[in-house]
């Protein structure tokens, strides 16, 4: 499924193991949309057993390409501590990164997370969001 780079795909489009295999191939070839959708699949347990660490891995691969939905998803993973150690600073960093990349849905989450943080931590997250991948061990 080499078209994955050019189409918007949702997990519901993957209905069997053969399609999942094709999608995995596209993700391994660097298709950010396929990487993001694999993150969603592992995050939600669609077709495969739910695996938050695997979800984080695939979201991070897509985020390396500035895929805004993956940046937002990473914010949620850090906010909830799903597959990673919970961190409001890293959650806010990813939400800021997604917002800067045009994902306006991040703004609500920015407000929610920032309300429970100290001003200096909010500022740190804002600074880190300029180059979020430098702040994450992959």
Q: Which residues fall in each region the model found?
A:
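Hydrophobic face of amphipathic alpha-helices that form TPR/SEL1-like repeat modules
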Residues: 5-9, 35-44, 48, 73-80, ...
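Short helix-capping/linker turns of helical repeat alpha-solenoids
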Residues: 28-32, 44-46, 51, 59, ...
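TPR/TPR-like alpha-solenoid signature
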Residues: 36, 57, 72, 92-93, ...
């Amino acid at each position: 499924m080499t078209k994955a780079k050019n189409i918007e795909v949702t997990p519901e489009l993957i209905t069997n193991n053969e399609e999942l295999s094709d999608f995995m191939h596209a993700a391994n070839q660097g298709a950010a949309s396929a990487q993001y959708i694999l993150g969603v699949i592992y995050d939600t347990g669609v077709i495969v057993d739910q695996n938050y660490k695997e979800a984080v891995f695939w979201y991070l691969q897509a985020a390396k390409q500035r895929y805004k939905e993956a940046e937002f998803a990473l914010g949620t993973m850090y906010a909830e501590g799903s597959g990673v150690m919970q961190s409001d600073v890293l959650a806010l960093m990813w939400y800021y990164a997604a917002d800067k990349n045009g994902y306006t849905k991040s703004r609500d989450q920015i407000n929610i997370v920032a309300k429970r943080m100290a001003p200096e931590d909010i500022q740190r997250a804002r600074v880190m969001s300029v180059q979020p991948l430098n702040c994450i061990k992959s």
